[in-house]
Design a protein with these regions (language model features):
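Structural boundary micro-motifs
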Residues: 1-89
Length: 89
């Protein structure tokens, strides 16, 4: 599937990828699941899981592909951390 990656101001590139696609940086993991959306998992001091445009998964040089297993481990650990924090309140 060819996907056009855009930021809010400029064209970035057109990629030919198979969905789902998994990418990561030092504190973010991404699951690209459609032509324009991805799930972003933030690990670390302020863990979060959110929906965002796929340009987030391609905007910096230090972001690279990762395995589904790596993404799922980060997703489940982050979800557990978020739920544990809410339970403590």
């Amino acid at each position: 599937m060819k996907i056009e990656i855009k930021s809010t101001k400029e064209f970035i590139e057109i990629l030919d990828i198979q969905l789902p696609k998994f990418r990561k940086s030092s504190v973010f993991y991404y699951k690209i699941f459609s032509e324009d959306k991805c799930v972003m998992v933030e690990i670390g001091a302020t863990p979060s899981i959110s929906l965002c445009p796929i340009s987030r998964a391609y905007y910096a040089d230090y972001i690279h592909d990762c395995s589904e297993a790596d993404y799922m481990a980060a997703y489940h650990d982050t979800l557990k951390t978020i739920l544990d924090e809410k339970h403590e309140l």
